[in-house]
Amino acid sequence: MANDKIVIHGARAHNLKNIDVTIPRDQLVVVTGLSGSGKSSLAFDTLYAEGQRRYVESLSAYARQFLGQMDKPDVDSIDGLSPAISIDQKTTSKNPRSTVGTVTEINDYLRLLYARCGHPICPNDHVEITSQSVEQMVDQVLELPERSKIQILSPVIYQKKGQHKKVFEHIQKEGYVRVRVDGEIYDISEVPELEKNKKHDIAIVIDRIIIKEGIRSRLFDSFEAALRLADGYAVVDVIGQEEMLFSEHYACPYCGFTVGELEPRLFSFNAPFGACPECDGLGIKLAVDEDLVIPDRSLTLREGALVPWNPISSQYYPQMLEQFCLSFGIDMDTPFEKLSKEEQQLILHGSNGRTFHFHYENDFGGVRDVEVPFEGVLNNIYRRYHETNSDFTRDQMRLYMTELTCSHCHGYRLNEQALAVKVGGIHLGELSEKSIQDALAFLEQLSLTEQETMIAKPILKEIKDRLTFLQNVGLGYLTLSRAARTLSGGEAQRIRLATQIGSNLSGVLYILDEPSIGLHQRDNDRLLDSLRKMRDLGNTLIVVEHDEDTMRAADYLIDIGPGAGQHGGEVVAYGTPQEVSENPNSLTGQYLSGKRKIPVPKERRKGNGKKITVVEASENNLQNITVDFPLATFTAVTGVSGSGKSTLVNEILKKALQQKVSRSHAKPGKHKKITGFESIEKVIDIDQSPIGRTPRSNPATYTSVFDDIRDLFAQTNEAKVHGYKKGRFSFNVKGGRCEACKGDGIIKIEMHFLPDVYVPCEVCHGKRYNSETLEVHYKGKNIAEILEMTVEDALEFFKHIPKIKRKLQTIVDVGLGYVTLGQPATTLSGGEAQRMKLASELHRSSNGRNFYILDEPTTGLHAEDIARLLKVLQRLVDNGNTVLVIEHNLDVIKCADYLIDLGPEGGAGGGTILATGTPEAVAKVSTSFTGQYLQKILNK
């Protein structure tokens, strides 16, 4: 059989319908189709799973126990398979120690660069700290012009107060006759008495020499004597020139600041040797945040200005506060902001040892009657956070704490010694703070000595290659110090992609999950070039993608469908993008050929005249911008990757609104103020996180339709005869559920050296309920059979029950009719979870004062899904609500009522408002990249 194809026979993972697929090797292959059609089942759960399993199978049983086992995918055979590497979006590191630099391994090379070519500079005296042997010192002095006059000095005292009489006695005993005191040369017997309270410098004059031939051995002796007397330091005073400083140690000859030998571990913030001792290399420290403790300073103490001390379950702290205020004469009915500075300090930081009488009786008769100092609210929270053994108390105290930049290392994570070492005039912390684009430019023009250039050449090549790859996948705006946990899924995936390109492997099967997410159209071409480069190295790329540019760039396109869930799982079309676009059965093909498209709305909403305004936003790269968000409109925030969209919407607007409207503890990013929030009642963030963390959560429970279904079952005659209430039909509580599997329907069996096996429960056979409960029927079906229904079937089944029908209809409206009511939440994709949340919002009665925020809602969505999503979003706005999206997808952007375009670039080059207004207005702004692409699509 030819080796130029991967041939799959009988793939049945999830909803795949026993399909046969042939995929050409060493090509860029795009797998597309509706959300839920089976693309990921083919790419990840079949191809990747089998490629990985075969590799792991080849290892010893001992090694396999550490790697974890993979199930054999449900497929008859796969031929022509290569070792598989999956680059998805879910495996982003949440470790606070992971940064862009560590994930890409650039930090490893930078540490090597600084260890081999770094110059330690004393932070106090700003002189270079060098370590030299006596021979090197002598050689350096002999390079001076002939007949130069020099004095070799031994600096025994540097900037120390005192008269130093014993020092002079010791010098005399050693037989030396001249000393230099505070820059003046004296005979040892004629040294004036020094001022006791002034700092002085004292150096012994070891030798006076004129540079000429034959003095080498004399220099050796003089240096050795100088170094011995001054603990490894020597100074050469060249008459008429600057002094030369020498040290046997990596230590400053003036203040003694020591660096030690330069080695790579000194520059690692994850090693005790290099980490800042104050923050342990995290760059941040937890501190109690005054703004979270007193979010509203216009309140009085009696009205609850101190949020952590408001009476919830105990009166202990409220009574303490009242008795303290009485004792110290503080008025509890004055707004906190109007209290004097001293009174505020007392409340926040404590009485500094001054006591007051505290009497307290608890509900159980316990009495406390003591004279105590007042601890202060901030100190109290900090102490309780660190001393408590209760997770609940620690979590509660954590709500009032925030991460502040470490004052010791200024957020650079490294200790003082590591930060003293510089290459090109900057230390590693400063280089890590530069954007990838700027770091590359800095290294390109780095000037090194001839010897350093030879050492640094291979190191710099590796660093520059990796930085270039990151820039080529549109990440030039990120800094190397950026924490990995703060990256979006798309950014994290492209970082791993850049790392793989850097590895230069060939013959590998790469499987990618929507690499274009979070990428502006402008950056897409560079990403595609990177993918082609990987292909040209001799790799097979299988990309699950909906982006039109990526599909058109593919060598081979596979369309899975025709629908989603049970309506999908078949190969609808395959071939070149041109061949697929000509296939009448392919939805993707119809969008590619332009036969189907998402229409531009006939008119744009003007809103209700009200707006929310964020004033002077300056978090991250935002340049002090003031932004209006019109209410009762569909608004999109656009801009190139890294321009500040997420900072503006997620870090400032969302958190500020949650703080004002929902009384949340979230602390918004830097801004002056926010106005207009009185016009909204709820802030709802509809993201792509799972709707539940356990298999017990499912669409029926999440949308609360299961409550109505259980009510219905409790009203049947059979249920009434047995006295069953609504709770009998829950699989989460004792009573109606199967106790053998606790309502899970499956039992986990742990296997050593093999994957854990999940088997259906032998008692209930996977039904989740006991036999008595399953005897209760509604219209011929029991509760377990209802959970096995798809939403579409359930809609037909319950069409005469308005309450249930309304909730199920909204799930169908968002395109999830194929999902079963009992499908575990953990098996829903991000896009499906997000649409389930939208469905849940749609069936709730709303007064039209909700503010919905969606961050890239088109992730994982086909053009047909996007058309459905837009209908749902427009429905929410038609009801008077406000919908705000962060989006790159032009089909969504062109349908918005109002755009806010940030830019012009990412990182430091972004953060300003380029254009606002309707899509038509933004399309006319020549400086806006979004506008340039919009113009093309609006003119189609």
Q: What are the residue ranges of the model-derived segments?
A:
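Conserved phosphate-binding elements of NTP-dependent enzyme cores
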Residues: 1-940
